[in-house]
Amino acid sequence: GLSEQQMLETKGRKTIDCGKWQVVGLPSIHGKALFGRVPLPGDMTTPPPYPPKFHHLRHGQVFNWWIHTGKLSVVHIDSADFIEQELQGREADIVCLCAIGRKYRPNYVKDVVRLLKPKYIIPCHWDTMLTPIDQPPKLLPGVNIPEFIDEIKACGVIPLFMPILGELYFDQNK
């Protein structure tokens, strides 16, 4: 775990210096990720029992993360719903884009590309995270990776699909 001095609570919108990098939490809202509903709504005001069961957990405040390394900017959109105003005025070389729940937000990929103008999009949040790391991952219900990749390409952006435990190299000069 992290020591107390390494932890920082944020309400978002403020630049957090992380060495030479800068990080900003952009307030967001959780998408309808499972069966058209927001999973685990609400906040946790006390720690859950240990070990927690799934129904003990809550998602709390949702953020998208803008990360600037000095040379490269990355935005991680971890829910298929977002607040457009929070993304306006920012650009990203790479967007890690949530694959689950996109069918519940019309023009999801188009809106992200229009707002952030990325060169690359990495689909994320597409597997159940329940399979052993050395076995093929299982898709979350409703995720269609080939369709998602086609949608990314149709917006003029290069999709980078990251294999589990794999490495992916790409030309940053394109």
Model-found features: residue ranges?
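Helix-loop-beta element that forms the nucleotide-linked donor phosphate-binding surface
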Residues: 1-7
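Generic recognition of short, well-ordered alpha-helical segments
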Residues: 2, 107-108, 143
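A structural micro-motif
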Residues: 5, 21, 72, 119, ...
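Binuclear metal-ion centers of metallo-dependent hydrolases, dominated by the metallo-beta-lactamase
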Residues: 8-15, 114, 120-174
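Core dinuclear metal-dependent hydrolase active-site scaffold
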Residues: 11-90, 166-174
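Short, low-complexity, polar/charged sequence segments that are solvent-exposed and flexible
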Residues: 42-46, 95-97, 114-118, 140-143
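Metallo-beta-lactamase
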Residues: 53-110, 115, 119, 123-133
